[in-house]
C-alpha cells in the first residue's frame, strides 16, 4: 500500500482512539478541589468564542490507546470565559494518570492540533495548574469537495487531503483502485476548515508503475456559506 494511504489509516485509527472516553467515577476518597478558569478565543481575531466545550479529565495511555475519564465538562460563556471547580481523586496521579484540561470543537468553531493551544496538563496536584488558561479555536467554514471520475486510467492509490497554515489537518479520501471508487460511491466530501484563510487541497494519484501525480490548490472559505471545490480524476 502506498505511504499516503498508510498515513490516512493511521490518522483515522488515532482519531477513533481519542474519541473513546468514559465518565470518571464520583470521588469517594483522597478528594481535593481544583478550579479551572480562563478564556477561549478566536485565534485570528482575539475575540472570545462562545459555547465551546471545555473538559477536565483524567488521561493516560494504555498501549496505543488513550484512556480518558471525564470529570467535568462546561461550555464557555458569551464572552468566551470559563470558570468552574471540581472534586478530583488525587490517587489517580499515583496510578499513572495525568489531569488534562481540553477545549473541543463546538458551535461555529473548530480546533486545530497543529496551531494554537488546545490543552493543558498537570502531573501532580496543583491548585493553580489551570488558572488563567487561554485556549485557541478557529471560526469554522464549510467546504465541499466534489469528486468527478472522468478518466479511465488505472492507479494504485488516490488520496485527497487538506490543511491550513502550512500543515495537514485531515486526510479526506483514500482509495487504492478505480474499482474502490465505484464501490465506495462517495462523490462529495464534507470538510470543516478555517474561515477567511486559504485552505490547501492536495490531490495525489499514484499510477500502477509508481509514478506520482500531485496537484495542490488553495481556496478561501467563508463562514457565511458553503465553498465548493471540484476534483476531476
Regions found by a protein language model. Name each.
Residues 1-20:
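Sec-dependent bacterial lipoprotein signal peptides
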Residues 20-35, 39-44, 129-140:
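Beta-strand-rich domain onsets/edges
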Residues 31, 120-130, 138, 176-186, ...:
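Solvent-exposed, conformationally flexible loop/turn segments
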Residues 35-81:
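Post-signal-peptide N-terminal segment of Sec-exported extracytoplasmic proteins
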Residues 45-64, 151-171:
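Short, ordered, surface-exposed loop/turn motifs in non-cytosolic proteins
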Residues 63-86, 169-184:
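Short, acidic Ser/Thr/Gly-rich low-complexity loop/linker segments typical of extracellular
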Residues 78-99, 179-202:
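Short Pro-Gly-centered beta-turn/loop motif in secreted/extracellular proteins
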Residues 90-126, 204-214:
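A short, solvent-exposed loop/turn motif at the edges and junctions
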Amino acid at each position: 500500500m502506498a505511504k499516503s494511504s498508510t498515513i490516512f489509516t493511521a490518522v483515522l485509527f488515532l482519531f477513533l482512539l481519542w474519541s473513546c472516553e468514559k465518565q470518571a467515577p464520583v470521588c469517594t476518597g483522597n478528594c481535593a478541589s481544583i478550579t479551572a478558569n480562563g478564556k477561549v478565543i478566536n485565534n485570528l481575531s482575539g475575540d472570545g468564542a462562545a459555547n465551546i466545550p471545555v473538559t477536565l479529565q483524567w488521561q493516560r495511555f494504555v498501549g496505543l490507546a488513550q484512556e480518558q475519564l471525564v470529570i467535568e465538562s462546561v461550555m464557555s460563556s458569551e464572552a468566551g470565559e470559563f470558570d468552574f471547580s471540581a472534586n478530583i481523586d488525587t490517587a489517580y496521579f499515583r496510578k499513572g494518570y495525568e489531569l488534562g484540561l481540553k477545549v473541543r470543537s463546538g458551535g461555529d468553531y473548530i480546533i486545530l492540533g497543529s496551531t494554537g493551544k488546545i490543552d493543558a496538563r498537570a502531573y501532580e496536584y496543583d491548585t493553580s495548574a489551570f488558572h488563567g488558561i487561554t485556549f485557541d479555536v478557529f471560526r469554522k467554514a464549510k467546504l465541499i469537495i466534489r469528486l468527478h471520475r472522468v478518466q479511465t486510467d488505472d492507479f494504485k492509490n488516490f488520496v485527497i487531503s487538506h490543511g491550513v497554515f502550512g500543515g495537514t489537518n485531515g486526510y479526506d479520501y483514500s482509495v487504492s483502485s478505480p474499482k474502490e471508487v465505484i464501490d465506495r460511491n462517495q462523490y462529495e466530501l464534507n470538510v470543516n476548515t478555517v474561515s477567511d484563510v486559504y485552505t490547501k487541497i492536495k490531490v495525489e494519484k499514484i499510477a500502477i508503475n509508481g509514478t506520482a501525480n500531485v496537484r495542490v490548490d488553495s481556496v478561501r472559505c467563508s463562514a457565511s456559506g458553503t465553498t465548493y471545490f471540484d476534483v476531476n480524476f
